[in-house]
Amino acid sequence: MLLDSLDITFLGHACFLLQSRGKRLLTDPYSPAIGYAPVDQFAGRVTLSHDNPKYHSCLDDVRADSVIRGLEHLGETMRSGPFQLHFIEVFERLPNDGPNAMTLIEVAGLRVLHMGDCGHLPTPAQTKACGRVDVLLALAGAGPTLKLPDLLRFVEAVGAKIVIPMHFGVPGLTMQIEPVETLERLWPFDVVTGESIYRVSRDEVTAMPLLRVLEPLRLRS
């Protein structure tokens, strides 16, 4: 029996295209003004962690059937095709400044967590709300988001086995944040680098955490 699979395409910054069973979900599209090429994608659904049209919620280059704003659905669970979505409240800064939504995406037997623009180590209650995480789309640039040692603590707390970095510094980016190599140096387990697209299924979830570094598809040449 063939297992369902999930294709994860890293477009750039915090924007991913997730595809399963012919359906497409896009997360946190950015504006090309930040230094990446335009997103230029179609998706049935787009999820937004918060309202930041420069870095996380630009819809100018996106064609979508509907947009789901996580902050309007905190604590709720909804289904969109093969994707089940649950939104967890965090903040850009503590205490309680800059509301933000982490998005838990259940698809193909996997639990995928997109960290949005979280700027702090999630509290025990927020971490508990995430439950088990198989694939973590992880904030890797430090700077305005959570510190990298806190990210490693969160990886351990949710039991994430596949960690895909996002929101890190690249040449030409208008935000001064750490490059992904900084996280690679801190990472205590295996690191695998690859192309922009990663196909994963439930049977690929390993016993030990793996850092899977994807090349941003929309990186300007």
Whereabouts are the PLM-identified features?
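Portal/gating segments that form or line small-molecule/metal binding sites
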Residues: S57-L113
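Conserved beta-strand hairpin/beta-sheet module of binuclear metal-dependent hydrolase folds
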Residues: L2-I34, D97-G116, V135
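Active-site environment of divalent metal-dependent phosphoester hydrolases
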Residues: P32-Y36, D51-S57, H120-T123, G143-P149, ...
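Active-site metal-binding motif and surrounding structural segment of the metallo-beta-lactamase
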Residues: P32-E76, K128-L137
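Zn-dependent metallo-beta-lactamase
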Residues: M1-R21, I68-I88, V205-T206, R212-S221
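Divalent metal-coordination and catalytic microenvironments
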Residues: L18, V46, L85, D117, ...
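Binuclear metal-ion centers of metallo-dependent hydrolases, dominated by the metallo-beta-lactamase
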Residues: I8-L11, D97, I162-S221
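Active-site-proximal loop/helix segments of hydrolase catalytic cores
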Residues: E92-V158
